[in-house]
Amino acid sequence: MRNITISSERALEVIKAPQISEKSTFIAEKTKQIIFYVSRDANKTEIKSAIEQIWRSQNIQVKSVQVVNVKGKKKRFGRYLGQKSDWKKAFVSLKGDREIDFTDVKLFEDK
């Protein structure tokens, strides 16, 4: 994966939130991967550079990124049939035995 630089605003658009569930916790303990909800138009290199930029103060380096496009489920609202939006999630592996502290986010440097 090549390195690209993106703005802080784009980094926050790419990474929406960490996925916190029983399954994601199990995967994090077993395979040392962290799961994120990401923007549908983001690619692997953007996801990698966004994570490294958001958690730059913790010196986080990404080893690999795997992406899954998830189809929205069909839901019924009374007699009407609707559909939830499609979304994308990313499985991120970090170099070494690093862990991300989600409370420590510094995007802009103090001048």
UniProtKB/Swiss-Prot annotation:
GO CC terms of this entry? ribonucleoprotein complex; ribosome
GO MF terms, alphabetically ordered:
rRNA binding; structural constituent of ribosome
List GO BP terms, alphabetically. Answer: translation
Which SUPFAM superfamilies does the UniProt entry name for this protein? Answer: Ribosomal proteins S24e, L23 and L15e
What function does this protein fulfil? One of the early assembly proteins it binds 23S rRNA. One of the proteins that surrounds the polypeptide exit tunnel on the outside of the ribosome. Forms the main docking site for trigger factor binding to the ribosome.
Q: Would you identify the family this protein belongs to, as annotated?
A: Belongs to the universal ribosomal protein uL23 family.
Protein's UniProt name: Large ribosomal subunit protein uL23
Its organism's taxonomic lineage begins at: Bacteria, Pseudomonadati, Pseudomonadota, Betaproteobacteria, Nitrosomonadales
Question: Which gene underlies this protein?
Answer: rplW
